[in-house]
Regions:
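Conserved N-terminal catalytic/coupling substructures associated with nucleotide/phosphate chemistry
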Residues: 2-209
C-alpha cells in the first residue's frame, strides 16, 4: 500500500518544471530573467509570490516545500507582472527571518537575490528562497502543518500529518498508544500464547550452549 506522501508525490511526478529550468531562468540575461520565470509553470518544486505577501503567508509555502521534496520560491512576481523588490527593501530581512519567526523546527532555507528588469523597464531584483527537503516534519508556530502537492501547499489534517511522520520515520505506527485502552484490556490467554514462543526460544538458546 502506498503511503500518503508517496501517493501525493507520485501523482504529480509528471514532468512540469525541473530545478534545471528554474536555474536557467535565474541565470538568463538580466532583461530576460523576469519573463522566463513568469513563463514557468508553478508545480511541485516551484512557486512565485508577490513582494507584498506577508511573511506568515510565505511561511506556509516554505513549510509545505520542506515537508515534501524541497523547492524554490521566487518573490517579486505577481499576476504576470515583474514587480521587483527595490521598492520594498524593508521586507528582505523579514523574509530571511521567516524560518526562525514562523516555523518549528526552523526550516533550512537559502535566501538570495537575482537581478532583473521590472515591468516598468527599470533595473530591479527578485528574492529567491531555496528550501531543502526535511528529514522531519515541520509546522508553523501555530501548529498548522502543510505539504506541497503539485502547485498547491495543502494544510494537513491530523491523520495526514501522522502519516507524513510515519513516511519520514519520525513516528512508528505500532508505537502509538490507543486512546482509552490500558493493560487491563489485554486478553490474558492471548498474552500468554504470544509470550510462549519467546520463552521457548530462550530455553533452546540457553540449553544449546
Amino acid at each position: 500500500m502506498l503511503s500518503l506522501l508517496g501517493i501525493y508525490l507520485k501523482a504529480f511526478r509528471v514532468v512540469f518544471v525541473t530545478a534545471n529550468e528554474v536555474d536557467r531562468a535565474l541565470t538568463a540575461p538580466l532583461k530576460e530573467v523576469g519573463a522566463k520565470l513568469l513563463a514557468l509553470r508553478e508545480d511541485q518544486w516551484f512557486d512565485r509570490k508577490s513582494i507584498r505577501s506577508q511573511p506568515k503567508d510565505l511561511a506556509q509555502h516554505i513549510v509545505a516545500f520542506s515537508n515534501a521534496e524541497g523547492g524554490t520560491i521566487v518573490v517579486g512576481l505577481h499576476d504576470g507582472v515583474v514587480e521587483g523588490i527595490d521598492q520594498h527593501g524593508e521586507k528582505i530581512n523579514s523574509i530571511r527571518q521567516i524560518p526562525i519567526d514562523f516555523t518549528v523546527p526552523p526550516v533550512r532555507v537559502h535566501v538570495d537575490q537575482v537581478g532583473c528588469i521590472n515591468s516598468k523597464g527599470e533595473p530591479d531584483a527578485l528574492v529567491t528562497i531555496t528550501i531543502d527537503p526535511s528529514e522531519s516534519v515541520h509546522e508553523l508556530t501555530n501548529g498548522d502543518c502543510y505539504l506541497r502537492v503539485g502547485d498547491e501547499s495543502r494544510k494537513l489534517r491530523h491523520d495526514q500529518r501522522r502519516e507524513l511522520e510515519f513516511d519520514k520515520g519520525q513516528a512508528q505506527y505500532d508505537g502509538i498508544a490507543l486512546a482509552g485502552v490500558d493493560v487491563n484490556d489485554l486478553d490474558p490467554e492471548l498474552t500468554r500464547q504470544y509470550r510462549e514462543p519467546e520463552r521457548s526460544n530462550g530455553f533452546q538458546y540457553f540449553a544449546g550452549r
